[in-house]
Amino acid sequence: KPNSAISDTLYYIQEDCRFEGEICFLIKDKKIEGIGFGLDLTKAGIQNKMKKKGLPWERAKGFDKSAVFSEFVKFDGNIKTLEMKLFINDILTQHATHDLMIYKPAKILSEISSFMSFEDGDIIMSGTPKGVATYKKKDIFMGEIYIDGKLIISKSFEVK
């Protein structure tokens, strides 16, 4: 996503805008340095039109204010006990462990490195578990990241 996509506030965009909770990785010195929680927003109607035409999805994914993130904490790379939860209005909406990751962080890093360079501060959004849906104003999102069953990140976003 472009830098203009990153926001401190989660905004209601339009009716067919969907959220995706994701485990995110912060890059430093071309390696994964930190881990955080992110919400990736998608304009579903535009995405579907682009898919049908065989076109890239940038218009649906890279629009202004289409991503919000928690803080990032140091990450040692051990994904075996990694877990993500997303609650909306106190209801568990998405839940994923490392077992559900189609591509593990090392593979994602390797693949991306094969065609582009990383700079310090780049963020990799690792993909989305089931539970993608639309949202509305005043919804309260709570993203959580766990390692070894211990809560290491908890970030709340209220939709404006």
Task: Describe each PLM feature range.
Residues 1-123, 131-160:
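Catalytic-core "active-site belt" of small-molecule-metabolizing enzymes
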